[in-house]
Amino acid sequence: MDSNTVSSFQVDCFLWHVRKRFADQELGDAPFLDRLRRDQKSLRGRGNTLGLDIETATRAGKQIVERILEEESDEALKMPASRYLTDMTLEEMSRGWFMLMPKQKVAGSLCIKMDQAIMDKNIILKANFSVIFDRLETLILLRAFTEEGAIVGEISPLPSLPGHTDEDVKNAIGALIGGLEWNDNTVRVSETLQRFAWRSSDEDGRPPLPPNQKRKMARTIESEV
């Protein structure tokens, strides 16, 4: 069993215990108490899966947390601020674009658009987004550009459905890449996106997608137009 899995469970058990003590003093509001109940069920399930006793894990988690706090400075307790990263210029973000063969898909709170008339092109994906804890926090806009600078695809949040995770963005990127590669385009991802939103890429910044996944993603986009 992976040691990180065990220690993560131990710390989660102890932190749940701290939150329970807080609730016992009638200090928690309704959402706090609701999360406490849901997390209790989750911890029981994880304990059964791992074969670990919750009480024993709580004691071990307490030792881990105490050790961390002994080494912690007041400066480290500050909540890190988000960073805004930009691949695109203001002109690239605001520029209008036209699709000869428009394809569109809504994936959760993200809208994926692409022009399936584009064939045999070298395409790069660029994005502007915020980052926290070295992971993508909020996507502002992602666009696909040809070497000539033409926009041929886009991923943007839907204003009516706010909120998305880095995993949502990664899945949307995969769908866009699959649709573009279906027409024999070569797609690569900017270094910034590779680092924070799409970690599984080859040396050229081109995410490896098996042929069957490319076909599935392309068909998915087509079926939802």
UniProtKB/Swiss-Prot annotation:
Residue ranges, annotated region (RNA-binding and homodimerization):
1-73
The record's subcellular location field reads: Host nucleus; Host cytoplasm
Signal peptide location: none
Show the segment(s) annotated as PABPN1-binding. Answer: 218-225
Taxonomically, the superkingdom here is Viruses
User: Does the keyword section mention Ubl conjugation?
Assistant: yes
Motif window: Nuclear localization signal: 34-38
Q: Which family does it belong to?
A: Belongs to the influenza A viruses NS1 family.
The function of this protein is: Inhibits post-transcriptional processing of cellular pre-mRNA, by binding and inhibiting two cellular proteins that are required for the 3'-end processing of cellular pre-mRNAs: the 30 kDa cleavage and polyadenylation specificity factor/CPSF4 and the poly(A)-binding protein 2/PABPN1. In turn, unprocessed 3' end pre-mRNAs accumulate in the host nucleus and are no longer exported to the cytoplasm. Cellular protein synthesis is thereby shut off very early after virus infection.
- The protein depicted here goes by the name Non-structural protein 1
Question: To which species is this protein native?
Answer: Influenza A virus (strain A/Chicken/Hong Kong/YU562/2001 H5N1 genotype B)
Gene that this sequence comes from? NS
